Structure formats: C-alpha cells, structure tokens
Amino acid sequence: MTKLFLPMSVLVLFLSHGMATPIHSFHPDTLSLPCRQKAEQLLDEALRFMEKNYYHRELVDWKDLAAKARQQLLKADNCDDAYASITWCFKQLGERHSFIMPPDKAARYNGDEALESPSGLADLVGEIRGEWLTDSIAYLTIPWVHSDDSLVCERVADSVQAVIAGLDTRHISRWIIDLRNNSGGNCWPMLAGIGPLLGDGVYGYFVASGERIPISYNDGSACQGRHVICRVSEDHGYHTYAAHKSIVVLTGRRTVSAGEIVALAFKGREQTCLIGEPTAGLTTANATYSLSDRSVLVLTVCQEADFAGRICDGRIQPDQFVPTSNTAADPDTARSAAIAWLQSK
C-alpha cells in the first residue's frame, strides 16, 4: 500500500508476548542457508522500494549503499537481522522518519488482528478529551492514531466530531486544540475528526518531484487529492454554530509526524495562533510497502507544505513560544497563554 500516512513519530508507532523464537546464526560455521537467503531477500526488497520511492533518492549512491548493507548482513547474528540492516541504511541516509515495522506490529497497525477488547483499541488510539474552560472557550485533545484499519479510523473521526458537537453551543466561538501529546501515526482520522474546526477547504500539500497533492477536508471527509481516505460514518460531518472561530493550537516536542500535519493545517490561518514549543520536526510523509515476510517498510516519500504551498522543513515553530511548566502557581502555562490570547480577540 502506498497511501500516505504520518507516523508516527510515528510514529513514531511502534514485542509481542509469547513463546521465544529460535535464533538462527549467520556465522559461516553454523549458517542456515534458507535463513540467510530470507534475510538477503528482505534487504533486497527494501532497497528496491527505497531506490524507487525515497523522496531524496537522487542524492543516494544506491549501489554503494546496497553493497555496504549486505556486508552488514554478513555480520548478523540471527535471521531477523535483515531489519537491523535496513535500519542501518536509514541511518546512513540521515533518515529519522523511515523505519521497518515487524510482522506482528504491521498486522496490528493494518487491522489484521481482531480488536477483542476496549484495551486493544486503547493501545492504538490516544486520549480524546474535551471540556469547557469558560462560557465561550472550549478545549479538546486530538489523539495519536497508530492504526490504518478503516473501522478504527472511522471510529476515531466519529469520536472527535462527537466531542466537538458536545462542546459546541451558540456561545462557543473560541477553541483550544491540544496536540502536545500527539505522537503521530495516521493523520487522516485526525483531520476528518477536527474538520468542523477547519472548515471545508485545502489545508496543506504533499510535495514530491515537483508535484503537489492537496490535503483537504470536505463535509466529514479527509482527502488526499481526489481520494477520500477517511470519513465519518454519517452522511455529513458536523458543522459548528459559529462560522468564524478563534483557535489556538498547542504544540510541543511530543507533537510528532501526523500530529505535526494537523498543526500545519492550522498554521498561518486568520484568527489562529500556535502556542507552546517547537514540534518534533518529522514534517515529511511516509508510505508503507509490504515485504515478503509480512513486515512493512515505512518509507519517507515526500515533503509537506502548508495551505499556501510553503514547504515545512523540520520543526514547526509556534507563533508564541511558551515553555512547558508544571508549577503549583500555574500547572499549564501554555494553556493559560492560550486562554489569554483568545480572550484578547
């Protein structure tokens, strides 16, 4: 699958519990040929995807990288060390956002395993919380989403819009959106959920090889180009009472990847202010590629731009820097600053 999503930074996203797996040595005196062939195959698959799709592929000497990665594999101690060799490749590229997802994590992320209990869903989605701070100011958190399962994504989008609808009154015209603990994952349910506060329109772009693909929201649907990636279960999305809203987005060092895309969707808009600390700086987009052992290569394939088409390179800087604090006098200075900014409007 090559549908873009933002991990995580993950994402970043990402052992399993159960019986131990036997270790197969790669050392020549005890070498298991099928094991080594499997590892070499996985490395070759990953390198082919990287050479074809990596967003800075033209800057890489792929023959040299492949040769050195295979040398790394010869030093391996077990069959799973193909993953270590792939990770080594990313380190040589200076790549912080790409990674390899083992089969068990990939199955859970893609929804291949049944969510048998609420605790299972809680492992995939962060907290969604809302409250009134004053008669005119509402506050909500947008969760990280470590799943690509369509049902999970729909439930997240529904839940966020339900929180917004529950907070919305004719007197609420000012909102605080807290992304400080949003560690990323899948941006689409976040965007579909927060859509009532964005309104319909284009709010960013994926940029690669001179091409710009719009990121937009329209009546309950989050779209990549012309394709609906996530939407709420109802025929239409929620619409707030107030057409014109003042909004503060709280950001911090734990605002990562997909969380950063949500922050970028709001940055630079009228009557909107980002307050807090700079984000993590994983402002690139990833695509996923399945490998033969059912692991998944999560590969950075493009950059991100804001609604005006300006490329975001690295950390998103807040409009108003407020360092994290936790004092008895003021346990949340960033939120206090957000309230003050909104009350000045």
Regions found by a protein language model. Name each.
Residues 7-16:
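Bacterial N-terminal signal peptides
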Residues 3, 20-229, 246, 261, ...:
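Flexible, low-complexity junctional segments that flank or bridge functional domains
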Residues 254-256, 269-282:
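Short, well-structured beta-strand/strand-turn elements
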Residues 318-345:
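Low-complexity, Gly/Ser/Thr/Pro-rich intrinsically disordered linker/tail segments
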Residues 181-182, 251-258:
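Active-site neighborhood of thiol-dependent amide/isopeptide-bond enzymes
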Residues 1-7:
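Bacterial N-terminal signal peptides that target proteins for export
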Residues 234-246, 253:
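A conserved mid-domain beta-alpha-beta active-site/ligand-binding segment of alpha/beta enzyme cores
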